Amino acid sequence: VSNLRLNLTDFLELLHLDYVKLRLDENHTFQEFFSTEDSQIRVQSSVVARELLFNIQDISILTNALTTVVQTIGDSYSTNTFYKEILKSILSHSNFVHFVKKDETSAMVILDFYNSVRNTPFCQNDPLFWEQFASACIDANRFPEAESCLKTAFSKASIIPGYVPYQVETVQARYILNAFIYNFSTHTTSAEDVIKCLNSSYEHLFKYYDHPDNILAYVFNVSKSYAEVWKLSKSLLDGNQIFQFQSTIREILNRLKSYCITTGNTLENSPVYI
């Protein structure tokens, strides 16, 4: 499900599970669900794989295994490109969105996982890790922690020659928008706060819009939050502020239309239809 591309030998070595293959070979129930041919370990069905993962009773079983993998290969990633790609896949917050949104306990287990590996050689100096950690915090509505992670991501990126933090900027925009929406009902909000949210998030979201590696689908997915910001706060705005907000949305729509033309997509099938 997470596309780690590990074969059976990798799993046995990284998790120190020398007995597993024997159990797989002799247990007919395991063989109904798993295949170990050609030194590969596969779940027989992608549907079964997703159900097994998403319905795990104790999410800490998963995070403990992932922590072991990260700590085991953390010292070798610099000389092994394959291991580096594995680390990137494991640390992607998209693996955990289902669990973070499931309940508060699961969310805390996921955040504990990120905390448990933050000081490993790969994670502590990698902007990607801190960006993914921030994204998981945003998913869990833990905005102070997200802000701290983003500051660290920008700091680590600044000392890497030639590193362009385009995706960190996108996550920063997502943080600003989601924090505004989450806090709207519990904090006194002024029209100036709305415009500050609008301008600041837009600046981050489109700062590296033209960078060739920027993931524009993600940029536009984040931009859909403007619709919720507008819905919540439009009654606070005066005529000039309404015009400013709508002008910004029109500019985003124009960029979206250009994106759809370039990719051969349609507005209805685009990442966000505002």
Predicted features by range, described:
Residues Y19-Q40, L205-N214, K257-S270:
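Charged/polar, low-hydrophobicity segments characteristic of intrinsically disordered regions
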Residues I86-V97, Q132-F133, Q172, I176-A179, ...:
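Structural register within alpha-helical repeat arrays
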Residues N3-I159, Y166-T170:
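C-terminal leucine-rich, beta-strand-based interaction scaffolds used for sensing/assembly
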Residues C123-A136, V171-F180, K257-N269:
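Short secondary-structure transition/capping segments
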Residues A134, I138, E147, K151, ...:
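Long, compositionally biased intrinsically disordered regions
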Residues A65-V70, K102-T120, F143-S158, F184-D210, ...:
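Alpha-helical repeat scaffolds
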Residues Y19, F33, Y77, Y83, ...:
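Sequence-level detector for tyrosine residue identity
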Residues Y83, I110, N119-D126, Y163-Q172, ...:
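Residues that mark the junctions of alpha-helical repeat units in TPR/alpha-solenoid scaffolds
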